[in-house]
From Swiss-Prot:
Native organism: Prochlorococcus marinus (strain MIT 9312)
Stated name of the protein: Photosystem II reaction center protein Y
Gene Ontology cellular component terms for the protein in this record: photosystem II; plasma membrane-derived thylakoid membrane
Pfam families: PsbY (PF06298)
Subcellular location per the Swiss-Prot or TrEMBL entry: Cellular thylakoid membrane
Family affiliation: Belongs to the PsbY family.
Function according to Swiss-Prot or TrEMBL: Loosely associated component of the core of photosystem II (PSII), it is not always seen in crystals. PSII is a light-driven water plastoquinone oxidoreductase, using light energy to abstract electrons from H(2)O, generating a proton gradient subsequently used for ATP formation.
Record keyword S-adenosyl-L-methionine present: no
Self-association state and partner proteins as the record states: PSII is composed of 1 copy each of membrane proteins PsbA, PsbB, PsbC, PsbD, PsbE, PsbF, PsbH, PsbI, PsbJ, PsbK, PsbL, PsbM, PsbT, PsbX, PsbY, Psb30/Ycf12, peripheral proteins PsbO, CyanoQ (PsbQ), PsbU, PsbV and a large number of cofactors. It forms dimeric complexes.
UniProt keywords, alphabetically: Membrane, Photosynthesis, Photosystem II, Thylakoid, Transmembrane, Transmembrane helix
Membrane topology label: Single-pass membrane protein
GO aspect biological process, one term: photosynthesis
Amino acid sequence: MLRAIVVFAPIIAAVAWVVFNIQKPAREQWDRQFGEK
């Protein structure tokens, strides 16, 4: 059980970091396109 946590925690953290970094510029561009109207 502990080994699974040690293995999956960095993977989940990396995926979450990538998703966050992809979402942030996409959200800014979304606001730029649709927020002005």
